[in-house]
Amino acid sequence: MEGPGAAAAAVGAGPGGSNVSAFLTKLWTLVEDPETDPLICWSPSGNSFHVFDQGQFAKEVLPKYFKHNNMASFVRQLNMYGFRKVVHIEQGGLVKPEKDDTEFQHPYFIRGQEHLLENIKRKVTSVSSIKNEDIKVRQDNVTKLLTDIQVMKGKQESMDSKLIAMKHENEALWREVASLRQKHAQQQKVVNKLIQFLISLVQSNRILGVKRKIPLMLNDSSSAHSMPKYSRQYSLEHVHGSSPYAASSPAYSGSNIYSPDSSTNSGPIISDVTELAQSSPSASPSGSLDERSSPVVRIKEEPPSPSRSPKENEPSTTTAAAGNSTEQPQPQEKCLSVACLDKNELNDHLDTIDSNLDNLQTMLSTHGFSVDTTALLDLFSPSMTVTDMNLPDLDSSLASIQDLLSSQEQQKPSEADAAAADTGKQLVHYTAQPLFLVDSSAVDVGSGDLPIFFELGEGSYFTDGDEYNEDPTISLLSGTEQPKPKDPTVS
């Protein structure tokens, strides 16, 4: 069985078969063998060969020349060397041909031309060209991918930087929040302490009350204020005993000063505040008339000073005291004890003032003396500024009043003790607001914001050498006669 195959291989290698493959040599021998013509043989033209009955050919012929009996492997090897199957027209129909005939042909596989077998080469796939094309495509793709990767990398780096910045900002914000929480806690503690302090003040004020500071004379504030609290007794006391006349005044209760029907918010009111009692020069005028009087505010006479606003705006009052004197005693230094009075005491005091005014009117009408009241009202009017006051116009009237009072005291020296309540009169002007005299314990007399009239207790309000010494109204305040004034203006 192996004789024909080996012989064919030797034959193929003999005539130059060194360049011809063993498959081609075996195929040439197989086709040339006359014993295999019923299964494989040349075509009539000699350009191709036919294979009949592929099954029988695979079983009987292929094992003799090849190591297999698979027809499919034989056909695949033919295709590898460039043999192509020839298809006839009758074989392309739907009807299966009666005869199993397969024809293969190759340009260099021709009958009688064995030397052409050298030209038959086994097909080699062009891997290099395919690889080159693939490499080009891959390089383009790789370049594009690299570009895209670089872009994505740049974006990623920017996002990373933004995330890092946001992280730092977040940490800073958290630190700030922590510090703010600590500050808020501290501030809350401070606020709580302040609230507790204010609550304690309010509670203590409800129990003890707060004394209100009251501005006195020469205050131009016209705003109305509430009544001060806590009633005290009101008294006028003499400090020095150089005057032969001791001005005695009973301690008035709060009901005697103001009454409900008194016009505290309307025009000026002239009322009697003190009563002058004639006493011997040896009498001691420095004694206190009321042992229960509140602490004393000393009033002294000083030169006029620039007006200073009080710490709190409260009703302004103007007071003028007219004293009765026939001689020229030494100026009396008066101490003013002030208290905040209740409603009943104010009413009683106002009743006393009304009665004193009636007595004064009766006294003036009895002696046929007339006083220019309009000038006095203008003098003490709250709407009139101190620079508009013309005190020399009132010289005659005030001097006449002083002479009249002096003459009455000389005519009735024996009735001084019996009628002590009707002899001496002191004029006090009440404006639209009620008169409140301030306690020295509640008001800082030495403060720069209080009016000058609080300091009258230390000396004369009008100093020596000043042009105000010639004002007769000053004699009423000091208890001494003064010459005619030149032309002063009150500041």
Swiss-Prot record:
Residues 275-333, 464-491 are annotated as: Disordered. Residues 279-288 have a biased composition (Low complexity). Residues 333-491 are annotated as: Transactivation domain. It is found in: Nucleus; Cytoplasm; Nucleus, Nucleoplasm; Cytoplasm, Perinuclear region. One of its GO terms (biological process) is negative regulation of protein-containing complex assembly. Residues 208-229 are annotated as: D domain. Residues 317-331 have a biased composition (Polar residues). Keywords: Activator, Centromere, Chromosome, Cytoplasm, Cytoskeleton, DNA damage, DNA repair, DNA-binding, Kinetochore, mRNA processing, mRNA transport, Nucleus, Stress response, Transcription, Transcription regulation, Transport. One of its GO terms (molecular function) is DNA-binding transcription activator activity, RNA polymerase II-specific. Pfam families: HSF_DNA-bind (PF00447), Vert_HS_TF (PF06546). Low expression found in most tissues with the exception of blood and liver. Highest levels are found in the pigmental layer of retina and in the lymphoblastoid cell line MSB-1. In unstressed cells, spontaneous homotrimerization is inhibited. Intramolecular interactions between the hydrophobic repeat HR-A/B and HR-C regions are necessary to maintain HSF1 in the inactive, monomeric conformation. In heat stressed cells, HSF1 homotrimerization occurs through formation of a three-stranded coiled-coil structure generated by intermolecular interactions between HR-A/B regions allowing DNA-binding activity. The D domain is necessary for translocation to the nucleus. 9aaTAD is a transactivation motif present in a large number of yeast and animal transcription factors. This is Heat shock factor protein 1. It comes from Gallus gallus. The gene is HSF1.
